[in-house]
A protein has these predicted regions:
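Sec-dependent signal peptide cleavage junction
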Residues: 18-26
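C-terminal regions of proteins
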Residues: 299-301, 306-361
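A structural signal for isolated positions on well-ordered beta-strands in alpha/beta enzyme cores
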Residues: 113-115, 141-143, 320
C-alpha cells in the first residue's frame, strides 16, 4: 500500500511539473517580462568603436516596474560589437534568473525594439545581417524615417544611396525573419511619441526630403560648389541620406538623451542647414537633453559643436562622440564652448539615467 502511495505521489508531482517543462521546451518565453524593478532606470550603452573606426550603435535598457525594454538605436556595422553585446545581455539575464542552463534554448527570447536613424551601412548593417535573423531575439517593432525620393536611374551613384540598398535589405529581412513585427515609417515633419517600459521616446522625422526639388538644389549649391560632376555623383547620395536622419529623444522624469543620426552641419556662416532646420522646426527647448549623441559621429571639426553645446545640451550635459579620432576633431570644437564630452574610442560609454539624475560609473 505504501508503495502505491509513493508512485501516486511521484505521478502527481510529474503532472504538476509538466506545464513548466512544456513551457521551457516548446512555448516562447519573454525574458523581458521576467525582469521587473521598483527602481525605474535606463542604462545607456554607447558601444565601443575603437576596433571599427566608423560604426554607430547604442543600447538602451529600460528597467520598468512591469518589464525590461531593450531599445537598439541603429546597430552599427556587421561583425562589430552590437550583436555580441545583445547575446551577452541575454546570457546575463538568464544567469540572473538562475536559468543559465537554458542559454541554448531558443524558447527563451530577448525582445528588442529597433530604431534606425537612417539607412547607412555603418548604422544598420548589423540589424539586417545579424540581429533580426538571430533565433534568440524577438523583434517587437522597427521605427525608421521616410525614404528619400532621390532618383535611382544612375544619375548619381546608386550604390551610395543607403535607402536604395541598405533600407531595402533591412525591410526584406524584417519580412523574412520578423513578419509579425510592425514597421513604423514616419512622414516628413512628423513627431511620434511612444511609451517605454519606463519613460517615453519621441521620434522626430526629417522635416523635408533633401533628395528632390529645391532642397536637392540646396545640397548641391551649399556642399558641392564648383566640384566636378563625377565627385557630386559619387558623394551626393550619402549627403542626402545623412541630411534625412531621424532624431530620437528618450526621457525619464526630468532627464533625457538625444540621438541626432548623421544630420548635416558643415558651415559656420549659415543657419539654414539640415541640423539648423530640425532645431528650428521642433524647437531647441523641446530637444534639449542631458546627453546628446554628436551628429555624424564627431567625424570632423564641423560647426555642429556650437548648436550642440548652446542649443541641444542642458547645462552640465555631455556629448557622446562615436568614432576613432573624434577627440581631436569634434572634441576640440566642443572644448571651445566648454562642453563636456566622452568618446567610444575609449571603449563603451555607459550612463545610468533615473528620473532625477544621470551618472557614469
Amino acid at each position: 500500500m505504501d508503495m502505491k502511495r509513493f508512485w501516486l505521489c511521484c505521478l502527481l508531482l510529474l503532472l504538476l511539473a509538466l506545464p513548466a517543462l512544456c513551457q521551457a521546451e516548446g512555448t516562447p518565453v519573454s525574458l523581458n517580462d521576467m525582469i521587473k524593478t521598483d527602481s525605474e532606470r535606463i542604462e545607456l550603452r554607447f558601444l565601443d568603436s575603437k576596433n571599427n573606426a566608423k560604426t554607430d550603435a547604442t543600447l538602451l535598457l529600460c528597467y520598468g516596474k512591469e518589464r525590461l525594454e531593450v531599445l537598439v538605436v541603429d546597430g552599427g556595422l556587421a561583425n562589430s560589437r552590437c550583436y555580441m553585446e545583445l547575446l551577452n545581455l541575454r546570457k546575463d539575464l538568464l544567469s540572473a534568473l538562475n536559468l543559465s542552463d537554458q542559454a541554448k534554448n531558443k524558447d527563451y527570447q530577448l525582445h528588442l525594439t529597433l530604431v534606425a536613424t537612417h539607412s547607412h551601412k555603418d548604422h544598420i548593417a548589423a540589424l539586417y545581417s545579424e540581429i533580426i535573423p538571430c533565433k534568440f531575439f524577438t523583434i517587437d517593432a522597427l521605427y525608421m524615417p521616410p525614404a528619400t525620393a532621390l532618383v535611382t536611374d544612375n544619375t548619381y551613384d546608386d550604390s551610395k544611396n543607403g535607402d536604395a540598398i541598405h533600407r531595402v535589405r533591412l525591410l526584406s529581412t524584417m519580412r523574412d525573419s520578423a513578419p509579425n513585427a510592425p514597421v513604423y515609417t514616419l512622414d516628413y515633419a512628423q513627431a511620434l511619441i511612444f511609451p517605454l517600459a519606463c519613460g517615453q521616446a519621441t521620434l522626430y522625422a526629417p522635416i523635408q526630403d533633401y533628395g528632390v526639388g529645391d532642397t536637392l538644389t540646396y545640397i548641391k549649391n551649399v556642399y558641392y560648389p564648383g566640384q566636378a560632376d563625377k565627385d557630386i555623383r559619387a558623394d551626393l547620395p550619402v549627403a542626402v541620406v545623412n541630411a534625412n536622419s531621424m532624431w530620437l529623444r528618450v526621457e525619464l522624469g526630468d532627464k533625457s538623451v538625444l540621438f541626432t543620426g548623421d544630420i548635416m552641419k558643415k558651415k559656420s556662416d549659415r543657419e539654414d542647414e539640415p541640423m539648423d532646420r530640425m532645431i528650428a522646426h521642433y524647437g531647441a527647448e523641446t530637444l534639449r537633453s542631458d546627453i546628446v549623441k554628436y551628429p555624424h559621429h564627431g567625424i570632423s571639426r564641423n560647426p555642429a559643436a556650437k548648436p550642440v553645446s548652446q542649443l541641444l545640451l542642458k547645462e552640465g550635459g555631455v556629448a557622446v562622440l562615436t568614432t576613432k579620432g573624434a577627440r581631436e576633431k569634434a572634441g576640440q570644437m566642443l572644448a571651445i564652448y566648454d562642453a563636456a564630452f566622452v568618446t567610444t574610442e575609449d571603449g563603451t560609454q555607459i550612463f545610468t539615467m533615473t528620473a532625477e539624475s544621470v551618472t557614469q560609473p
